[in-house]
Amino acid sequence: MPRYELALILKAMQRPETAATLKRTIEALMDRGAIVRDLENLGERALPYRISAHSQQHNRGGYFLVDFYAPTAAVESMVEHLSRDIDVIRGNIVKHPLTQELKECEGIVPVPLAEKLYSTKKRKK
């Protein structure tokens, strides 16, 4: 199963309501076969701009990151679930940055002088 990261912005709510929303979201992930690794609270802060979601205007929101493994088929249904949840302002699922393929730098590859001089410019006769 690939590793994903869920970035959530929740409505500004009291602590019990926020906990209930997070619990509901995590349970929805696990119902779809996900294995949750970590939940990180990034705090409540002002949104960068006013966001309309579910017929409401939001100026503040709680930011959360959820790190999880899930089957690829579960991601699409989870995005749909998040879009219907009235307490979620924004939800975005991306592949975890640490699992993306990284290529090692091969260093500087020397180019032969003749190829460098004659490959791009042909001399006039």
Swiss-Prot record:
Coiled coil: none annotated. Keywords: Mitochondrion, Ribonucleoprotein, Ribosomal protein. Pfam families: Ribosomal_S6. GO terms for cellular component: mitochondrial inner membrane; mitochondrial small ribosomal subunit; mitochondrion; small ribosomal subunit. One of its GO terms (molecular function) is structural constituent of ribosome. Belongs to the bacterial ribosomal protein bS6 family. Component of the mitochondrial small ribosomal subunit (mt-SSU). Mature mammalian 55S mitochondrial ribosomes consist of a small (28S) and a large (39S) subunit. The 28S small subunit contains a 12S ribosomal RNA (12S mt-rRNA) and 30 different proteins. The 39S large subunit contains a 16S rRNA (16S mt-rRNA), a copy of mitochondrial valine transfer RNA (mt-tRNA(Val)), which plays an integral structural role, and 52 different proteins. PANTHER family: MITOCHONDRIAL 28S RIBOSOMAL PROTEIN S6 (PTHR21011), SMALL RIBOSOMAL SUBUNIT PROTEIN BS6M (PTHR21011:SF1). This is Small ribosomal subunit protein bS6m. It comes from Homo sapiens. The gene is MRPS6.
